[in-house]
Amino acid sequence: MNDKELQTIRSRCEKATGGKWTAYIEGRNIECGSSFIQTADNDLEIIGATIADYDFIAHARQDIITLLDEIERLRSKEA
C-alpha cells in the first residue's frame, strides 16, 4: 500500500465517532432486549448482524488505527 492509500484509511477512521467502541451482546454482556455497539457518542444497533459482526465492527475502530500506527512505525525504521 502506498502512503496515500494509508492516509485515506486513517482519514476514514478519524471521521468516525471517536473513543472506544464496545459491543454489548444480548445474553452475553447484557439482558436488555437487543445487542448494540456503544460508542463515545451514541449506541449503534445493526439489524441482521451476527455476534461476530458486532465484535468485528466494535473492535475495528481501535484495531485499524493500531495497525496503521504499526505500519508507520515499521516504515520509519526502514528509512
What would you call each of these model-derived segments?
Residues 1-69, 73-79:
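Extreme N-terminal leader/activation tails
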